[in-house]
């Protein structure tokens, strides 16, 4: 794959269109149903040429146009991006994708971390069951999930771990949890290291686990890609939408305000052009 676009808002689809017009293989990756605040907007009046259109309809028009040009789409949350020579590996739930360039278009939403989560990441806390599940074979683990996608992750971990407890970070259907996975009706508050294990403190008590897996619909920028420079919670870019790492670009609300559809579309276009130029130099 030439370009992997993370995010399916206006910036992402705009980037995909321009990339395909440049003849580059392109995939747009985002969790199913995610379209940011725009998907819930009842009426948009300030997008040129399309007055009084709903946000959902506008997004679908962007999507259909990009797909018609040959862009691919994948429903998954990208949990981590790692440089791999002149390529990038994107860990996307139960899959690993490779691309020559990455364009980040995830919007402005940022997850709120549990106290202690960042400190324990990679040391008992993980965002990827496929990547790290093997380290917890025969051990006790917990799954903390903000959506029903965590049910599938819990099922995978159950095939490895001795026991799996499931905590819903936000209300969602847990009726399809497999046998052997216990739903715990407690609210996680914080994480800490205790007795050589991960202590999960809830609104009721403290539970000790060998590992804790956390699944949300977004990943903190500083944990998504090591070395990515930010400014006030936004990705720092230059006028060509180049981020601080070679081969990485960003567009849309993720680069900061003003949070406008037209800005996102324009930045997506610029990012695709810059990414195409970067790939051409790779030879």
Residue ranges, per PLM feature:
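Residue-level detector of alpha-helix initiation sites
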Residues: 9-10, 33, 148-149, 255
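N-terminal Rossmann-like FAD-binding beta1-loop-alpha1 element of flavoenzymes
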Residues: 2-27
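Glycine-rich FAD pyrophosphate-binding loop
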Residues: 21-39, 167-173
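Conserved N-terminal glycine-rich FAD pyrophosphate-binding loop of Rossmann-like flavoproteins
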Residues: 32-55
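FAD-site-proximal beta/loop scaffold in flavoenzymes
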Residues: 113, 119-135, 215-263, 270-273, ...
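A Rossmann-like FAD-binding core segment of flavoenzymes
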Residues: 66-85, 89-91, 97-99, 159-239, ...
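Glycine/small-residue-rich loop that forms an oxyanion/phosphate-binding "nest" at active or ligand-binding sites
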Residues: 73-138
